[in-house]
């Protein structure tokens, strides 16, 4: 007898996030769906980023968190009123000089000076699409400081925004750190973690995407939280990271799956190579 296909394992269509995102997991979503435990109702992501895993998984509910208040503010605005958001973005995206350095840096300055949540959400998308390499980076004054990307063409992600808004009706977006987010999990949940990566030996240190360094001690603490959730609450936790001696050591006790993926962050095209990615599975 034929069994029905599980839609958590094989999403019919892959949906791209409306944001560019350094270290995004769009290429890893099929592998992750294959290791997520079945019959769980809620996916919890303490490091949601652009939301590629959320967009390409099929759970009843989502709890999606990040420590970047601009990102969570943007997601909540898109969720609540995508039509108004799109109409506000278009004049900025389609301005005659939108793809120039002068215009970009003027908008960046406006973003850094503004305290209006809606204005910041609109400019965040513009800066993301026109800035360098999908980076989201702030300086010590909490000012967005990603340089102009100087791309030949640009794209307004209206379809992606509308799909995100549709999918987001089953999601809650929270500005919280990973420890706070772990506390929200119950027996119906699976936790997926995509932390800022510890740099490879040849990399410059681009781990502090939200202006907060996520160092080796944070990496170790996250691993301990995953182990504690597994042993104390019988929760399943999945973590993706570079496949290195360090990550294999801190995730010791998990089941490992190794895959090769294209790097989505670099300072030069020569560094866009396939690297070994480790998926650590703490099965509850």
Question: Locations of the language-model features?
Answer:
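SAM-dependent nucleic-acid methyltransferase catalytic core
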Residues: 2-28, 34, 81-207, 221-232
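Conserved acidic-Pro-Pro-aromatic motif
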Residues: 188-279
């Amino acid at each position: 007898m034929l069994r029905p296909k599980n839609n958590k394992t094989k999403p019919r269509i892959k949906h791209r996030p409306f944001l560019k995102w350094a270290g995004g997991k769009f290429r890893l979503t099929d592998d992750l769906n294959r290791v997520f435990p079945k019959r769980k109702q809620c996916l919890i992501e303490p490091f949601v980023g652009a939301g590629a895993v959320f967009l390409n998984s099929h759970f009843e509910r989502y709890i999606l968190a990040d420590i970047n208040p601009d990102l969570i503010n943007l997601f909540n605005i898109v969720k609540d009123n995508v039509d108004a958001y799109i109409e506000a973005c278009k004049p900025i995206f389609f301005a005659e000089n939108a793809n120039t350095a002068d215009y970009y840096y003027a908008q960046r300055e406006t973003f850094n000076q503004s305290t209006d949540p809606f204005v910041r959400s609109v400019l965040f998308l513009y800066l993301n699409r026109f800035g360098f390499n999908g980076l989201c980076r702030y300086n010590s004054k909490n000012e967005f400081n990603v340089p102009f990307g100087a791309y030949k063409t640009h794209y307004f992600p209206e379809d992606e925004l509308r799909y995100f808004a549709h999918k987001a009706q089953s999601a809650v977006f929270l500005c919280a750190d990973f420890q706070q987010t772990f506390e929200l999990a119950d027996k119906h949940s699976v936790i997926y973690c995509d932390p800022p990566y510890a740099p490879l030996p040849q990399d410059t240190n681009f781990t502090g995407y939200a202006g907060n360094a996520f160092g080796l001690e944070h990496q170790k603490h996250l691993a301990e939280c995953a182990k504690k959730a597994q042993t104390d609450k019988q929760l399943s936790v999945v973590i993706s990271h570079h496949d290195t001696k360090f990550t294999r050591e801190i995730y010791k006790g998990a089941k490992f799956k190794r895959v090769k993926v294209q790097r989505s962050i670099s300072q030069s095209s020569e560094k866009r190579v396939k690297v070994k990615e480790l998926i650590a599975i703490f099965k509850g």
